[in-house]
């Protein structure tokens, strides 16, 4: 039978360091409500559509 390798030692430290790095990045990230993003996208699309209707050509 094959021997099972132990996952102790540096494996746990690397895992913990990765989690700490993730949480540090999460704290410094800009937090925007998803509804705000959707509203901004719809407003931008409507604005571009109006500009295209006013100044652009129709296909």
Swiss-Prot record:
Cellular-component GO terms for this entry: plasma membrane
GO biological process assignments: protein transport
One Pfam short name: Sec61_beta
Membrane topology designation: Single-pass membrane protein
Positions in the Extracellular compartment: 56-59
Similarity-based family: Belongs to the SEC61-beta family.
Role played: Involved in protein export. The function of the beta subunit is unknown, but it may be involved in stabilization of the trimeric complex.
Name recorded for this polypeptide: Preprotein translocase subunit SecG
């Amino acid at each position: 039978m094959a021997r099972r390798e132990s996952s102790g030692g540096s494996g746990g430290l690397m895992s913990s360091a990765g989690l700490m790095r993730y949480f540090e990045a999460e704290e410094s990230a800009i937090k925007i409500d998803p509804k705000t993003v959707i509203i901004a996208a719809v407003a931008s699309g409507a604005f571009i559509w109006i500009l295209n209707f006013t100044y652009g050509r129709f296909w």
